[in-house]
Amino acid sequence: MQEKPDIPDQVILSCLQTEYGLDCRGVEFLPLGADVNTAVYRAESASGQGYFVKLRRGDFTEITVTLPHFLKSSGIHAIIAPLETSSRRLWAELDSCRVIVYPFIPGRDGYEQALSQAQWREFGRTMKAIHTVALPPALSNAIPRETFPSEWREQVLHFQSLVEEKTFAEPVAAKLAACMQANRQTIHQAVRRAEQLGRLLQTRSRKFVLCHSDIHPGNLHLSPEGAIHIVDWDQPILAPAERDVALIGGCPAWSNPAAANWFFEEYGRAGLDPLALAYYRYERVIWDLAAFCQQILLTDAGGQDREQGYCYFAGNFLPGHEIDLARAVDPFPDS
């Protein structure tokens, strides 16, 4: 969220005191991320201890906090586990929001700072540990399984029809509509290819592993000491491993072949399916297109988040960006 929500700072401070026993002297809104349902803050105690405070409205499931807590307890050090409340819960309630508190670790994300060779190797080892962890039944039964759904593809085609039929007065919506019209053929090709690959993958017997499902540079936090942390476990899923590793080499910030080699030397390439990698790269584009269409075409609200959303949307079509990188790994991109 790029714009601060209409929640007084004192209300957040009172929640931290009441629910977590934290005597914080202030909170600072951090304009981070593209998720319009999540606001994040930095809180600081009187002793100078920092906390990362997430306010989540809308859908919430316990697995988003219980899973990282389990992974951290299992020895996967790249996970930042949420703190417990005074009543030993992993979140608190604040009006219509859930409040989740983490230790604040200074650093930058993978968009702001390139990973070193050592960090790429640690990233590969960490993802291997996540994909091979043994989940207890209580957790595995609570995590959705991949079904290769057509929902997002259908939404993109719906929005494509909408921009062909409707004129948008709001400037950002008008820009997005024009971008969709200019890239009509590219969008339809990506949707068609994802549909073909999804049907094919449904017929194959594939091992499902625990996947983060939203591995991208913005969800990789790099500390000044060089440690890496995988954050934002809002949508875990049991799926083929390609769901997570598709963006290694599949987004502009991570398209350096040498970096991908460092990652896979630790993670391993055995068993990875090029068709599954292509499917998840196409689907990643389609998920983003649908989400930004919802954000921008269905409402005029959102302020600065709208312009940022448009930039993310349009970036998919730039040379060497997400669409091109999906086609690059697809053995039959024009099928």
For each of these PLM feature ranges, what is it?
Residues 36-45, 52-53, 82, 192-245:
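Active-site acidic catalytic loop and adjacent metal/ATP-binding pocket
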Residues 113-182, 208:
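A cross-family kinase active-site recognition segment
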Residues 99-113, 161-173, 286-303:
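A glycine-centered beta->alpha junction motif in the catalytic cores
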Residues 39, 44-49, 57-63, 76-78, ...:
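Phosphate/dinucleotide-binding and metal-coordinating scaffold of catalytic cores
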Residues 241-272, 282-300, 310-316, 320, ...:
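Active-site activation/catalytic loop segments of kinase-like enzymes and analogous catalytic loops
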Residues 143, 272-281:
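All-alpha amphipathic helical-bundle segments outside canonical DNA-binding/catalytic cores
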Residues 46-142:
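ATP-binding pocket architecture of kinase catalytic cores
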Residues 1-29, 185-186, 192-193, 200, ...:
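Regulatory N- and C-terminal appendages and interdomain linkers associated
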